């Protein structure tokens, strides 16, 4: 059954409780706090509030804390995963979104405690169970990182 194209155009938000229901990530690896804008099947904007309490700041770097760039890309990927799950609806039950490829990652400016990351992701392509996205992370409307990446949705393996 095809989704109604107009239904996808409805803009919506997603709070942390729903994010936790949608993706398997948990502390200390949950990198998106909420989605403030989403068009199902197309794009989303996620928020990550960066605080000094993040465990990675203990070692990166103790005297000058900087959020690791790979975790910014992970935050974009988690935002995209929520978009995929929300887009698929009940078809995503029993499935998990796996991050599989990152390309053209660029890190433009350090992200430090107190920053609020705005994680803009847009679907470039979707074929079968593979989704390709372009992501841009901003702080105060300044681009701090960007990348293209792909994810695959697969059956979740039962836990022993």
From Swiss-Prot:
GO BP: fatty acid biosynthetic process; lipid A biosynthetic process
UniProt GO molecular function: (3R)-hydroxyacyl-[acyl-carrier-protein] dehydratase activity
Q: Does the keyword Hydrolase apply?
A: no
The highest taxon in the source lineage is Bacteria
Query: Which keywords has UniProt assigned to this entry?
Result: Cytoplasm, Lipid A biosynthesis, Lipid biosynthesis, Lipid metabolism, Lyase
**Which regions form coiled coils?**
none
Catalytic activities:
a (3R)-hydroxyacyl-[ACP] = a (2E)-enoyl-[ACP] + H2O
Q: Active site located where?
A: 60
Keyword Ribosomal protein (UniProt): no
Q: According to its UniProt record, where is this protein located?
A: Cytoplasm
Quote the InterPro entries the UniProt record gives: FabA_FabZ, FabZ, HotDog_dom_sf
Enumerate the CDD domains for this protein. Answer: FabZ
Enzyme Commission designation? 4.2.1.59
Q: Which HAMAP family match?
A: FabZ
The record describes the protein's role as: Involved in unsaturated fatty acids biosynthesis. Catalyzes the dehydration of short chain beta-hydroxyacyl-ACPs and long chain saturated and unsaturated beta-hydroxyacyl-ACPs.
Q: Which family does it belong to?
A: Belongs to the thioester dehydratase family. FabZ subfamily.
For this entry, the protein name equals 3-hydroxyacyl-[acyl-carrier-protein] dehydratase FabZ
Origin species: Rhodospirillum rubrum (strain ATCC 11170 / ATH 1.1.1 / DSM 467 / LMG 4362 / NCIMB 8255 / S1)
The major lineage groups are:
Bacteria, Pseudomonadati, Pseudomonadota, Alphaproteobacteria, Rhodospirillales
Which gene holds the coding sequence for this protein?
fabZ
């Amino acid at each position: 059954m095809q989704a109604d194209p107009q239904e996808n155009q409805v803009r919506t938000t997603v709070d942390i409780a729903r994010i936790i229901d949608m993706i398997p990530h948990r502390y200390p690896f949950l990198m998106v706090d909420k989605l403030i804008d989403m068009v199902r099947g197309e794009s989303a904007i996620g928020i990550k509030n960066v605080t000094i309490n993040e465990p990675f700041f203990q070692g990166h770097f103790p005297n000058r804390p900087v959020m690791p760039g790979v975790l910014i890309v992970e935050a974009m990927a988690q935002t995209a995963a929520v978009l995929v799950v929300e887009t698929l609806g009940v078809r995503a039950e029993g499935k998990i979104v796996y991050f599989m490829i990152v390309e053209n990652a660029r890190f433009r400016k350090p992200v430090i405690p107190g920053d609020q990351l705005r994680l803009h992701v847009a679907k470039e392509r979707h074929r079968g169970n593979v989704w390709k996205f372009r992501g841009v992370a901003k702080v105060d409307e300044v681009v701090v990182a960007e990348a293209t990446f792909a994810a695959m949705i697969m059956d979740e393996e039962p836990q022993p």
